[in-house]
A protein has these predicted regions:
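A short, N-terminal "cap"/entry segment at the start of jelly-roll beta-barrel domains
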Residues: 2-40, 121-134
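Histidine-centered catalytic micro-motifs
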Residues: 55-62, 95
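Short acidic-glycine-tyrosine-enriched beta hairpin
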Residues: 78-93
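Short strand-coil-strand connectors
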Residues: 39, 75-79, 102
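Ligand-binding loop in jelly-roll beta-barrel domains
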Residues: 93-118
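Conserved short histidine dyad/triad with adjacent acidic residue
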Residues: 44-58
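Structural motif
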Residues: 42, 71-73, 96, 105
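Glycine- and acidic-residue-biased ligand/ion/polar-headgroup-sensing regions
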Residues: 61-72, 77
Length: 134
């Protein structure tokens, strides 16, 4: 009987509150993320300080978002939509979007498909062209 050596399944498990895991990126002043890559999708756990505003941007990848903690305003396709803990949303590829955290800040889980190449390494920025607010 031949047993092939493989990675433990435990390596596929993470916790949104464990700040010591993931690929770390700074997305803007008061906005940081931890990235977890798979072959077909990517998870980004974003921490946004109170009242911080993310830059409006777009990318070709589809993006799902889940508000884990806090509240804010999602700016998407030119609309401003209030979001709170438990809300989730879809941002189709190439749609301008951003976020403004509420007075208590926010923690958001974003899921990208396919994975964003720009996020596969630590660093800063969104890795895409930033749009000027209208």
């Amino acid at each position: 009987f031949f047993m092939e050596k493989r990675m433990s399944q435990k390596n596929y498990f993470n916790n949104v509150n464990d700040e010591n895991t993931g690929i770390k990126r700074i997305l803007g002043e008061g906005i940081s993320t931890r990235i977890f890559c798979g072959d077909q999708a990517m998870v980004s756990v974003v921490t946004i300080q109170p009242n911080c505003v993310g830059q409006i941007h777009s990318h070709p990848e589809e993006q799902w978002g889940v508000m884990l903690e806090g509240s804010g305003i999602r700016i998407q396709g030119g609309e401003r939509i209030e979001i709170k803990k438990g809300d989730f949303w879809l941002t189709p590829g190439n749609v301008d979007h951003g976020i403004e955290a509420g007075e208590n800040g926010a923690k958001v889980m974003d899921i990208f498909s396919p994975p964003r190449d720009q996020y596969k390494k630590s660093g800063s920025g969104f890795g895409v062209k930033i749009r000027k607010p209208e």
